[in-house]
Amino acid sequence: MELYKLKAHELKDMISKKEVKVEEVTNSFLNRIEEVDEKVNALLYVAKEEAVNTAKELDKKIESGESLSGLSGVPVAIKDNISVKNMQNTCASKILEGYVSPYDATVIENLKKNNGVIIGKANMDEFAMGSSTENSAFKVSKNPWSLERVPGGSSGGSAVAVASLEAPISLGTETGGSVRQPASFCGLVGLKPTYGRISRYGVVAFGSTLDQVGMFARDVEDCALLTQNIAGLDKMDFTTVDTPVQDYSKSLNKDLKGRKIGIPKEFFEEGLDEGVREAVKEAIKVFEENGAEVKECSLPLSDYALAAYYIISSAEASSNLARFDGVRYGYRDAEAENALDLYVKSRSKGFGEEAKRRIMLGTYVLSKGYYDAYYKKALKVRSLIKNDFQRAFKEFDAIITPTTPTPAFRIGEKTKDVLSMYMSDIYTVPVNIAGIPSISVPCGFVSGLPVGLQIMGNYFKEDTLFNLAYSYEQSTKWHDKIANL
């Protein structure tokens, strides 16, 4: 049996029933990585020895009569900006090349506690800044559905790992759509939880008021399983909220009777690919067939979200990335003649083009004379956008839109057109600005490329998202499609 083709919940059940050993499952995925990763460049580090050792330990527990809870030995790929003790944590940047984390992020502690097997560190856009994974200092990840196209970003490697069957589930991070957009491009389920639902302790910061850990899976059940095992309050992250984590498995039912869904007209205007538009419209009919009431609504201020996002996120990046100075850790220029020279040369050579662009933009909008005109104004717009969503959620349980305006674009197509690249996040960014949860699920294909449907929910209503996404998924077969590598 080709175990790497199975989904996480199927593997969990087989391991629990002692039909297969954790080590067998782990080796199946390690062999798959060896077979296909050079084609798609999903991983920056393969944790072969660590994964096999963990698998053997879990098998010993099972043999001694202990039942494994949580993930029960299922492999997980981890984005390379999430700290895993004794593994590299490069953020796909030259400035952190060779850096090894001395501790586990809280989400990794939770994964280990719940018997997950970490199989490798995934490629990404440098410091999570990008929408294509072309900004990695080390390699360009490729979309398994078309190797000439991008997988999306910034969590492109995490998406590719699951879409190419190198891992059944994976962790990424979200600042402006970095899980949902690659999920859409790669035909996966991708969740961005509520800001504060999951700890960010041990995750390298980009935009601190926007960042959130997210997850990739091949179906909604797997996504719910992974979320269940990492969510919750953390004393190490004061932004986490003491709100009970529901049993998400109870939300996995098909009936949508009584559910009210809003369709915002602003997300279906000029710039949306016609094929994507038709796929999403067909998907909306399925929700109605399953009992939901669907009605047009308006989110008029969402048009301003992208501009506000790039001001706020760049300002926060400028502050967060100031710590990479060539002194304490990371890349240190050997030719520097004094302290100032060390800072300038280490940062100039260590950071890539996009990271430097955003640092400069952020420094500019925070500077005297421009703070009020840009940063402060962006924060005011953010508050108005939050209010827009809260008005909508007084009437609707969820809001449905396309995840991205187009399917995956070609590698190199948008690298010289920065604004065009930024526009690929136009439908995902409002969610991060508001801090609400959102899930992307596969809803069809355009010219052989996957298309994603986005479902937005109110704060801490991940259970509602899982209910709606599962209902749609069970009425279609898009989630069962696998890329042919």
Curated annotation (Swiss-Prot):
One of its GO terms (molecular function) is glutaminyl-tRNA synthase (glutamine-hydrolyzing) activity. It catalyses: L-glutamyl-tRNA(Gln) + L-glutamine + ATP + H2O = L-glutaminyl-tRNA(Gln) + L-glutamate + ADP + phosphate + H(+). Belongs to the amidase family. GatA subfamily. Keywords: ATP-binding, Ligase, Nucleotide-binding, Protein biosynthesis. GO terms for biological process: translation. It is an enzyme of class 6 (ligase). Its EC number is 6.3.5.7. SUPFAM superfamilies: Amidase signature (AS) enzymes. It comes from the Bacteria. The active site is at K79 (charge relay system), S154 (charge relay system), S178 (acyl-ester intermediate). HAMAP family: GatA. GO terms for cellular component: glutamyl-tRNA(Gln) amidotransferase complex. Allows the formation of correctly charged Gln-tRNA(Gln) through the transamidation of misacylated Glu-tRNA(Gln) in organisms which lack glutaminyl-tRNA synthetase. The reaction takes place in the presence of glutamine and ATP through an activated gamma-phospho-Glu-tRNA(Gln). Heterotrimer of A, B and C subunits. This is Glutamyl-tRNA(Gln) amidotransferase subunit A 1.
